[in-house]
Regions:
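Conserved eukaryotic protein kinase-like
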Residues: 1-171
Length: 171
């Protein structure tokens, strides 16, 4: 992901370039575009536009352009990495109230995805590095490359079933 400047207002944006030589990259691009097409919520990262073109060598090039989140990911706040030789580091600590507000923001985004979209969406990759923080430390869930649509009929059939599968460090 790169930081860029867009338009006459010099708006900061995040540019997610997909490396199409990696297995599943095109599928991830399509999934993210489909998931983000019709969803709008204050706690979801806003996609501004997409780019699908050829690069200078004639290879396919795809990128997603997002609203820039100046405070980075929740991961960088929970597990800061200090630079070599940096005595104090850029020590950023979230208070209990800030952490609670971030949890509420993420829960609100998930509630929207699961219960208020035309077809419910399951994120499938929720982890601190995919939770981005704006200027006011409001959380925005991003990276919908693994998202799955759940047809309404399927959700009704599985009301009494639950599953918990995850990776260490994921939410």
């Amino acid at each position: 992901v790169y930081k860029g400047i867009l338009g006459p207002n010099d708006t900061a944006v995040a540019v997610k370039v997909l490396y199409l030589h990696q297995q599943g990259a095109l599928k991830s691009f399509v999934a993210e575009c489909e998931a983000m097409r019709n969803i709008r919520h204050r706690n979801l990262v806003k996609i501004l536009t997409t780019c699908s073109s050829l690069d200078f060598q004639g290879n396919d090039f795809k990128a997603l352009i997002y609203e820039y989140m100046p405070n980075g990911s929740l991961e960088s706040w929970l597990h800061p990495i200090s630079e070599a030789g940096d005595v104090d580091g850029d020590l950023r600590i979230l208070s209990l109230l800030q952490r609670l507000n971030i949890a509420i923001d993420v829960a609100s985004a998930l509630d929207y995805l699961h219960h208020h979209c035309q077809d419910p969406i399951v994120h499938c990759d929720l982890k601190p590095s995919n939770i981005l923080l704006d200027n006011d430390l409001i959380a925005h869930v991003g990276d919908f490359g693994l998202a799955r649509f759940v047809p309404e009929a399927t959700t009704r059939c599985n009301l009494n079933q639950s599953s918990s599968v995850g990776l260490k460090g994921t939410v």
